[in-house]
Amino acid sequence: FENGHFTDVARNIYLLTKFGNNYKATAMFCGNYITAKSIVLPNSKVFLLEDNGSAALLDNDATLLWSGELKYRGGAAADIALYKNTLWASFPECNVLLRYNLSTMREELRIGGNKSPFSRPEGLFVEGDSVMVCNSGSSKLIQVDLNSYSVFEYEDFEEPIHQYVQVGDCRFAVLDSGLYLI
């Protein structure tokens, strides 16, 4: 996006970017490689999350190391993000963010719940020591400081926000009506 124009991307380049060097074998673990969420970890392992909450951790040669579910009170995780050595997941049905230990895949911390600052949290984007949380229920982008766990309203939209990302100086948001450069 350096020149301000979008460019078509070949399937293999998309898969390489999403799943890492062993993208062909890794993509075979996905029911739908387009909708599956993935994180290529610093050690080249890949964490996968399907829409139904099914999750897998694959070695760099696509060997299955762990499989299970990312669910909270019956609701599937909507998105995942990596911060340091932990995995964060959003659960829109419960208004919760959970932090998991990547070594044990055990829940370590919960933010939100009954009196939650979140309203249907979906997309997560880690930026420095903060995670940006897309609240589709309140149409707000929320910033969570990952050192103090303080929660701040960052930006308000006129319709639900589902995904947010920053690339260089450009910020993008996926709203109900489409993709926007903000």
Annotate each predicted stretch with a short phrase:
Residues 1, 6-10, 48-52, 89-94, ...:
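Conserved beta-strand positions in repeat-built beta-propeller and related beta-rich domains
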Residues 23-30, 63-71, 106-115, 150-155:
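A short beta-strand motif characteristic of beta-propeller blades
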Residues 1, 33-40, 74-82, 118-127, ...:
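Repeated scaffold domains used in trafficking and secretory/extracellular systems
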Residues 3-30, 36:
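An edge-strand/N-cap motif at the start of beta-rich repeat modules
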Residues 14, 56, 98, 140-142, ...:
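WD40 beta-propeller blade core
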Residues 109-125, 135:
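Eukaryotic tandem repeat interaction scaffolds
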Residues 17-21, 59-63, 101-105, 145-149:
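Short loop/turn segments that connect beta-strands within beta-propeller blades
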